[in-house]
């Protein structure tokens, strides 16, 4: 399997993404010599990894943008036949300890969401994974109102984490951004701040964009 060279500039990245529009996941996988999983129950990240590979993304699981040299984060988004997102979008792991001095401006969420290349993919379960097609990509930069909503949610969530209230945070908190347990394995543990200021063990959490927010982004482009 040949490794794809990262795109040199933004027009090249966009050209690659547009060339995938209308193509099935099976076609992309065949070009890379990969087999397509029957379903995504055990391979939840497979589609995203395939698209990353095809576009030449470099970050992998590192805490930085997928195309750091271009200032672009890549997000695949499963959609229904009406073009609506089918699930929330994972942004990054949430820091649950050592958060003194952390601000929105220097947070990983802010860094990742400065500029996002959204790649919609058919995601309805009745369509076999191999036959699901890739949609038209969208390059998005949050406008001032969207940035304000993201910052507001992030600051409120981080304040509750700092107060040791991580267990009280549910997916309902936040207008556009939510905090949820991240690990597929519920036995995975990480340090977090307890209400008395000491450290305790808890399940890792991740930041996710709510579907109402990503639907708004898609709607602005596709109407």
Curated annotation (Swiss-Prot):
Question: What GO cellular component is one of the record's annotations?
Answer: cytoplasm
Q: Which domain of life is it from?
A: Bacteria
InterPro entries, alphabetically?
DNA_mismatch_repair_MutH (IPR004230), DNA_rep_MutH/RE_typeII_Sau3AI (IPR011337), DNA_rep_MutH/T2_RE_sf (IPR037057), Restrct_endonuc-II-like (IPR011335)
Q: Annotated Gene Ontology MF terms?
A: DNA binding; endonuclease activity
Keyword Heme attached: no
Q: SUPFAM superfamilies attached here?
A: Restriction endonuclease-like
Give compartment(s).
Cytoplasm
Q: Which residues form a coiled coil?
A: none
Subcellular location, principal: cytoplasm
Q: Which CDD domains match?
A: MutH-like (cd00583)
UniProtKB keywords: Cytoplasm, DNA damage, DNA repair, Endonuclease, Hydrolase, Nuclease
For biological process, the GO terms are: DNA modification; mismatch repair
Q: Which Pfam families match?
A: MutH (PF02976)
| Annotated function | Sequence-specific endonuclease that cleaves unmethylated GATC sequences. It is involved in DNA mismatch repair.
Family statement drawn from the similarity comment of this UniProt entry: Belongs to the MutH family.
Q: What is this protein called?
A: DNA mismatch repair protein MutH
This chain's source organism reads Shewanella baltica (strain OS185)
Phylogenetic classification of the source organism: Bacteria, Pseudomonadati, Pseudomonadota, Gammaproteobacteria, Alteromonadales
């Amino acid at each position: 399997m040949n490794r794809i060279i990262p795109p040199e500039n933004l027009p090249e990245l966009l050209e690659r993404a547009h060339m995938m529009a209308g193509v099935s996941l099976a076609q992309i996988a065949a070009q890379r010599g990969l087999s397509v999983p029957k379903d995504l129950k055990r391979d939840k990240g497979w589609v995203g990894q395939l698209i990353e590979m095809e576009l030449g993304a470099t970050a992998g699981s590192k805490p930085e943008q997928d195309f750091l040299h271009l200032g672009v984060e890549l997000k695949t988004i499963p959609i229904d036949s009406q073009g609506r997102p089918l699930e929330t979008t994972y942004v990054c792991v949430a820091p649950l300890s050592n958060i003194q001095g952390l601000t929105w401006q220097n947070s990983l969420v802010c860094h990742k969401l400065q500029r996002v290349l959204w790649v919609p993919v058919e995601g309805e379960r009745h369509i076999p994974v191999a036959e699901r097609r890739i949609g038209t990509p969208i390059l998005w930069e949050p406008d001032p109102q969207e940035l304000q909503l993201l910052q507001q949610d992030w600051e409120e969530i981080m304040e509750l984490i700092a107060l040791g209230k991580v267990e009280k945070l549910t997916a309902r908190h936040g207008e556009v951004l939510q905090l949820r347990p991240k690990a597929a394995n519920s036995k995975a543990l990480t340090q977090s701040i307890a209400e008395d200021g000491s450290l305790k063990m808890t399940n890792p959490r991740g930041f996710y964009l709510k579907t109402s927010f990503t639907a708004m982004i898609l709607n602005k482009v596709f109407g």
